[in-house]
Amino acid sequence: MADWLFFVLLIMHWKLSKDFSSISEIDLRAHDALFDRLLHVHLQRNHLFCLSPSEVVALRRAIQFGPQALHVLSTILRRAQDYAASVGSATRHAVLMPLGSAVREPLGKEFYIKAEDASWWLEHPPSLYVENAVSDGGLYNFILSSGLRSLIGSPKYLMVRPFHGGGNPLGSVMEALFDERIQGICICDRDDACAVPPFPKDTTSEQAHVALHKMRVVDAQGQSEPRNPFFSFKITHGWGVENYIGPNVLNLFFNSHLEACTSRSAFLNAFPDFPALSETEANEWFSINFKSVTQDAENIERGLSGRFRIAADSTRCGLLAGLSIPKSVIPFVIASAKSGRHHHELLRAFDRDMRINIYRNAVRDLTQAAMDALAADTQMNFA
């Protein structure tokens, strides 16, 4: 039975519809409980409530908030520009409409939610669903936050809270505990040369896709259904989470763990200029199943020819198939990402990996999905 983890994450960016600027103060006060709730979950880092300075002034004037809510409004006012930039970086966000509004279809980045329905969304925040609680969860936390720092300059509006759910398979857990209301991101290992259904039988990706399709969250091709725009089903760019360990990060591990010299020699045999990789070698990196030293060389060849149109002989594929990343690499990355003598070296190694085109694109794909669903102000304080 596979371990699974979900991160209790932040739902999405919330904005107010322009309709609020044209209603009376009396009508605005009718929303006081909802605004108080939004400010509370913003303080709890469960949502990112984005208001313009004029909207903050209007709410303060019309509604008598308590000290805690006023504190949150002051923070939102002070960081209004930063929040606006965060909204701009997301591909979609929620727009709250006043009570009694007509139903509106999504338009561009905007997904419209009536005030009457807002509590439903607030009570069902999204999560990041992955396999293998401690290892996968910790590594994705590092990849997402570092990717955000590298791509837009700061990870402070992305927050991850781990929650270990036990040993049940990911697909059955999502199906048993959630329904079409599920929000967030599910990331599964590819475990194949192909990234679209049908997935290999009895793999996490196959079981998760079957469950999500039954829940009417994704279609037969694994794409999000329009009825639920705040859920993404993602398949790793390589065979698994291990492929997101770039060559420079792996080289840092080898430099600090001399006992892993045998593994390092294998990578040097396959990539003579390691950790530097040519474009072809970088594509090969994402075609290797680093979890296993018994990968079939034919799978490597199928991935290279099918995904990258690269012709590789059987000898080369056999050499690549014998590579594996030591199990202690992921714990090393997770520990160094927090603190320790290798912390800054790790960040520099990650930045070097981000100069590799295929690696940067793979991280950007996950980071964009995270920005859509996992927005939060991690600098909020409870004073």
Regions found by a protein language model. Give the residues of each.
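Conserved, well-structured beta-alpha core segment at the onset of a catalytic domain
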Residues: A2, A220-G222, F382
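N-terminal extension/subdomain marker
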Residues: A2-L107
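C-terminal structured domain segments
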Residues: R45-L59, I63, S287-A362
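Charged/polar, solvent-exposed surface patches and flexible loops
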Residues: T75, F142, S172-A176, N243, ...
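RecA-like P-loop NTPase motor core
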Residues: D82-C194, P198
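TOPRIM fold recognition
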Residues: D191-P197, S224-S256, S314-G318, S324, ...
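Short, flexible/disordered intra-domain loops and linkers
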Residues: A195-Q207
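Activity-critical C-terminal alpha-helical subdomain
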Residues: T204-S328
